[in-house]
Amino acid sequence: MDSSFNLAIHALVCLSHSGRSLSSEALAENICTNPTRVRRVLAGLKKAGMVETREGLDGGYRLTADPVSLSLRQVAEAINTRFVDCAWHSGDIDRDCAICSGMAGVMDALYRQMDEQCAAYLEQITITDIETQLFTQK
């Protein structure tokens, strides 16, 4: 997992809380990143119909999805987030050893199951839930 998921959630909560359009610069300042990174991540949210962009004086990004029902799983899927993944595989599928040739497949299945459990958990949490947590913390 990379920081894109965190950035997307942060931006969506900002947009929900503001109730208006915000520029990539305004979002970047609140997120503490650069506007180019914000635009890159929000492109996936725009494609998924969660935000829209507008040009002009009142331009920027505007939340179009209902934050009450927008789950963190939907956000993760919109930006292709995998929570548990491993790019490196031990062993060699061409070797004549059950452990050496089979470990990568077993571990990939394990990672997929862990990723699905994370996604199932995130299905229960919405953008409004995150916003509420932020404003009820002591």
Map each language-model feature to its residues.
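N-terminal helix-turn-helix DNA-binding core of bacterial DNA-binding proteins
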Residues: 1-33, 62
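Beta-hairpin "wing" of winged helix-turn-helix
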Residues: 48-64
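Key DNA-contact positions within bacterial/archaeal DNA-binding proteins
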Residues: 36
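Generic hydrophobic secondary-structure packing signal
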Residues: 4-7, 55, 114
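Non-DNA-binding regulatory cores of transcription-related proteins
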Residues: 64-138
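Short, structured loop/turn "capping" segments at alpha-beta junctions
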Residues: 21-23, 52-54, 128
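Basic amphipathic alpha-helical segments that dock to polyanions
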Residues: 41-46
